[in-house]
A protein has these predicted regions:
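Helix-to-beta-strand junctions that scaffold the AdoMet/dcAdoMet cofactor pocket
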Residues: 74, 97-98, 171-175
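Conserved class I S-adenosyl-L-methionine
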Residues: 74-85, 102-104
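Glycine-rich helix-loop-beta junction characteristic of Rossmann-like nucleotide cofactor-binding loops
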Residues: 68-74, 95-96, 144-145
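N-terminal auxiliary segments of SAM/dcSAM-dependent transferases
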Residues: 1-50
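Conserved SAM-binding loop of SAM-dependent methyltransferases across substrates and taxa
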Residues: 85-99
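Conserved alpha-helix/loop element of class I SAM-dependent methyltransferases that forms part
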Residues: 9-11, 33, 37-40, 54-78
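S-adenosyl-L-methionine
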Residues: 104-160
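C-terminal substrate-binding/active-site "lid" region of AdoMet-derived donor-dependent transferases
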Residues: 112-115, 165-231
Length: 232
């Protein structure tokens, strides 16, 4: 059986691939045909190339497979991505927003951003790499044009929710959305994960966010949750 691809029943620009053995995987339409980013499989179906989206490598994909009901990132959106690393999830976000959208990729590690530029951004017209620390959004405000529709945050910092909220105050439009992947051990190894998640949720609520969903990411990521919230 040839691999097949069909649109996801809920989320625009996200797809479901049915592989030769019947296994189902998430996929996105490849904005840079012929190139993969992290060794993911490329599938050609009805003249279009898709990239398999590995939920063990991407917390956003894991959250979708764990039943996330809201994925605010959509075609045409401007997205601020905090903690883009070498571009695994950011490249799929690039696929989703498409040529009419844009992804501003903030990353502090120089090695990671070199890989992001050389392997990803060079081949995608809708990505801007920014070598800066997400704790100081004022340092990169000149690189971001207007307000963004969404912020995606995946940074290993103790004050993750505060950092995201500081960025939202500066860059996120009213009624915009955020997705934040919280890793308990990055915040406090001495506390129970549930206590940490609740603390980060409280920070967001105190900073004008309406938390809509909290999804645990096991078995794809241990002691992680994905929080989806709307601003003001």
């Amino acid at each position: 059986m040839q691999a097949k691809v069909k649109p996801h029943p809920k989320f625009p620009a996200i797809y479901e691939a049915i592989l030769e053995d019947g296994a189902q995987r998430l996929a996105t339409k490849n904005l840079a045909p012929g190139r993969n980013v992290y060794g993911e499989r490329l599938i050609r179906y009805e003249g279009v190339e898709y990239r398999i989206w590995d939920a063990y490598r991407s917390k956003m994909a894991a959250a979708i497979l764990k039943g996330l009901k809201t994925v605010p990132i959509s075609p045409g959106h401007k997205v601020l991505y905090l903690g883009a690393a070498s571009g695994t999830t950011a490249s799929h976000v690039s696929d989703i927003v498409g040529e009419k959208g844009h992804v501003y990729c903030v990353e502090f590690a120089s090695r990671a951003i070199r890989e992001l530029i050389d392997n990803v951004c060079m081949y995608r017209i809708n990505m801007s790499p920014i070598l800066e620390d997400a704790r100081f959004p004022e340092k990169y405000s000149l690189f971001i044009t207007g307000k963004v529709d969404d912020i995606y945050c995946d940074i290993a910092q103790p004050e993750q929710a505060k950092i995201l909220a500081d960025n939202a105050d500066m860059f996120l439009k009213n009624s915009g959305w955020i997705m934040i992947a919280v890793k308990a051990q990055s915040i406090d190894v001495t506390k129970e994960p549930t206590e940490i998640y609740n603390r980060e949720i409280k920070v967001l609520e105190n900073r004008s966010f309406n938390v809509r969903e909290v999804v645990h990411l096991e078995p794809y990521d241990k002691a992680h949750v994905m929080i989806v919230a709307q601003f003001r």
